[in-house]
Amino acid sequence: MRELAWVLPTVAGEIAHWRSCAAAIPDCRLRADASANLHSSRLNAEGAALFAVLPRRRHSALVRGLVAYQTALDYLDTLSEHPCREQQVNGVQLHRALAEALQPSGRLSDYYRFHPWRDDGGYLPALVEAARAGCATLPAYERVRELGIASARRMRVQALNHAPLPERRDAALRAWAAHEFRGRDELAWFEWTAASCSSLSTFVLLALAADPQVQEDDVLEAEAVYFPWVCAASTLLDAFVDQRSDREEGNHSYVEHYDSPAEMVDRLCEIVYRSVHGARQLRNGERHALIATGMVSMYLSKASARSPELLPATRRIAQVAGSLPRVQLPIMRTMRAVQRLGDA
């Protein structure tokens, strides 16, 4: 855990920088979205920056790039939720930013082309350029670039999540998964789309690229563990702990596609186990395991995970993740409490 002693202060500085940028956004609605995301998604940024512990040497530019990318992702997800005439087209256009953030150069798209509000004062392009700048410092970036861009393009599936009619949404997601993962039966269609929504496979590739000695086999083996297993675990656990709020707000919940609560818990346990076990088998496996279990602990540390209806499942999931969550969960709960106190 000593690695967090330098990562977290760097994250705090980056978040403060982006908060000042968000506060200067001319359009009041975009300004509210950007500011609210930086307030509510701080743990997401800290989780992204945790990937900076993978390289043996400290790489501050990697942290800055990871935070910028995660901040852009959270902001885009919120923008995609706003109803508009071309909602799916709008979401796909907005999410172009994720792939372009991983391209070393090139003209940026008009991300707000189909969005009802446009004047962000350069906020989203600045996030994209900050992520690009982080990539440019990585000595082995060319070895991971194509896989990273492919991961970013998969994340466009998030645009389908916000379709106003559940029947059309589910049909679109099912068709997308059938096309993208034809012949692969490790996961159900909704588990594939859940995995594709996650940025964790992108983050591990960026972290590996910080090592000038990284080999192609190391990259491919890590990619195979993070996508689909770690990515699926991340999105599904997020849905697991947010079940009640998603129902109340009418949001799409991936875990509602399971046939029963028992099946949901069984599958979550299996996917979490595959994530953590696979991470341990990688080169520098202890650090990958720290990240995989840290992700599990981040979600299970949420207060809703300890509600009477979820607590038995929470305990079972934490158990299959091994011994590290016993240390990580109290730390994550404390971090959440400190954040709430700071916001009071």
Please describe what each predicted stretch is.
Residues 8, 14-48, 62-63, 93-244, ...:
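All-alpha helical catalytic cores of prenyl diphosphate-utilizing isoprenoid enzymes
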Residues 80-92:
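Short, glycine/acidic-rich hinge or "gate" loops at secondary-structure transitions
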Residues 243-258, 314:
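Active/binding-pocket-proximal capping segment
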Residues 282-294:
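Transmembrane helix-loop-helix
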Residues 294-344:
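Acidic, carboxylate-rich catalytic segments that either coordinate divalent cations
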Residues 252-277, 291-302:
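C-terminal, helix-dominated tail/subdomain
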Residues 72-83, 234-245:
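Acidic (Asp/Glu-rich) catalytic motifs at the cytosolic membrane interface
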Residues 48-60:
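Post-signal peptide N-terminal segment of secreted/secretory-pathway proteins
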